[in-house]
């Protein structure tokens, strides 16, 4: 572990209280403890970011029109892969910048690690993690236990096993239906937190016959025409399934008054994104940044009074680093925030993305370099010091 973690230059443990004191984000804390569902959606991506995509059907009509929602883009660390890195960012709010040489769940020990799991348990939540595929993938069966999830579920607990054509992965619709059974079995007298990793849209995208595609790109992608059609079909199915899930929670609230807030984000773009990206829409790191930007949505089955706090008016794509999604979700839920989460939200206002090919970004999405603004530099470096201590 020690060899895998990079200590930031100039790190001083004694300075951490002063660094944490820079967190200025006011708390929107309430007495509510809504149920929380955090979904890592396999390969969910918006190709209109990198190509003039034209298709014969809308791809995400549900998510794009969903009322009472926050929409934007989370920026993952990698292009075309790296699910477990994104999972690590979601659960710990730690950037992979300090652990660049390892796949987190395979290379780090998470016993007693700080994460959203432990934090929500400290607030009285019961916790569950689920994935409709093999438990051994990314060592999840071990690491989820180390993180302290009260219960974990894998393929055998998703009995529907509905797939799309010849693709071997359970559909999101079936995954959500099976998950509802697991969710309803959780203790009813406590607030519930669930982390769900989907599998439907995993590559590759040449498994089905052309006749099975339900969406067809009008844009010419040459050798990637079928690949794009199958992928876009999966995206539309994911969108429809999310609508079904929201309908389930809407009915739950109407029947029982149980509040639920949901966040879903794509883990990364599909692997072929670089082959179909239009260089006219960006060059070099600018294009890479777009390839790393995956859709997210936060929605609740009850009114969200502070949704504006999660919008960045300077950036039409409302981009944020993946490490900032969970504190944004907790803020929207009205929960008390740790100093670490409050610092991340303060950082988001000044430098929304700190992980990856650029030093960091400004609120409008443009790149910033260290040395241009001392106060902002200090805020970014302070995060990495706090992260190192967090690890």
Please place each PLM-identified region on the residue numbering.
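Intramembrane catalytic core of multi-pass membrane enzymes that act on lipidic substrates
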Residues: 1-3, 37-38
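Helix-hairpin-helix/helix-loop-helix acidic hairpins
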Residues: 2-31
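Solvent-exposed soluble domains appended to multi-pass membrane proteins
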Residues: 20-34, 38-41, 46-391
